[in-house]
């Protein structure tokens, strides 16, 4: 699918609901009739385990295997590594091998573009590719930003999380300047929100006032809920685990916002090609 959109979900701070967002955004887009590939770009393999693969180190092919073949200039067959989930999304899994690959990338030719080469092999089959990045700004995350069309930043309504946004935005700007000039920021998603608490309200208002002029802050806010954690432990999305709950409703709204951005961008690209 030539109109495939590659989105990196990234935040250098861990524990902001990034992997949960990747799973539920992917399933939400699939429920809208989109073909979706989830890519686990974190050696901790949380996304892989969240989709029902509790022993990722036993998987014969992972993202690390494929990226190593690209570094070694071997033939690659990404399709053989893709797993299919019952809720209509595909997964390119990760495991501990990815941590070793991070080191080997340092000496690789075109080291920032190895993941982009991998994505070029698969994106023709999908409407959306969602890359779940590790909570750092190291070489694998730079690879994800180099491969992506856009970035979504999940963040908690805590002061430290909001403070860390500035560092992340500087890194995105640097990648845009030096490697991927077409990289856009789709928006900031507030996660684990406790609407009744003052701090949630204050930090959300702060993020909107500081960044809202230039960057979209999604209308959807993901509420804090133990149900989301339980769903992950079961290898399911929130839609399969608690479809009538508040978290499912929030992720459904978020999925529609993301699809709307994608559709507007596709229409713009078509119009630009016709000029």
Where are each of the predicted segments found?
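P-loop NTP-binding core
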Residues: 1-275
């Amino acid at each position: 699918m030539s109109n495939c959109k590659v989105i990196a979900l990234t935040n250098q701070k861990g524990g902001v609901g990034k992997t949960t967002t990747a799973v539920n955004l992917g399933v939400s887009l699939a429920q809208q009739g989109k073909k979706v590939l989830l890519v686990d770009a974190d050696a901790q393999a949380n996304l892989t385990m969240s989709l029902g693969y509790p022993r990722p180190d036993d998987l014969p092919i992972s993202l690390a295997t494929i990226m190593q073949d690209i570094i070694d200039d071997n033939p690659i067959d990404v399709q053989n590594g893709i797993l299919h989930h019952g809720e209509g999304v595909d997964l390119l899994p990760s495991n501990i091998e990815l941590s070793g690959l991070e080191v080997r990338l340092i000496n690789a030719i075109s080291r920032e573009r190895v993941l982009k080469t991998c994505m070029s092999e698969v994106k023709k089959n999908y409407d959306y590719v969602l890359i779940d990045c590790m909570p750092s700004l190291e070489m694998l995350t730079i690879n994800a930003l180099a491969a992506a069309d856009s970035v979504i930043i999940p963040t908690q309504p805590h002061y430290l999380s909001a403070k860390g946004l500035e560092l992340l935005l500087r890194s995105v700007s640097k990648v845009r300047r030096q490697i991927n000039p077409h990289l856009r920021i789709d928006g900031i998603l507030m996660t684990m929100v406790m609407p009744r608490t003052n701090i949630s309200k204050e930090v959300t208002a702060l993020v909107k006032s500081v960044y809202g002029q230039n960057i979209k802050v999604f209308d959807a806010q993901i509420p804090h809920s133990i149900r989301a954690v339980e769903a992950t432990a079961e290898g399911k999305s929130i839609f399969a685990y608690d479809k009538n709950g508040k978290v499912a409703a929030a992720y459904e709204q978020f999925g529609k916002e993301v699809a709307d951005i994608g559709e507007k961008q596709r229409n713009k690209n078509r119009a630009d090609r016709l000029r």
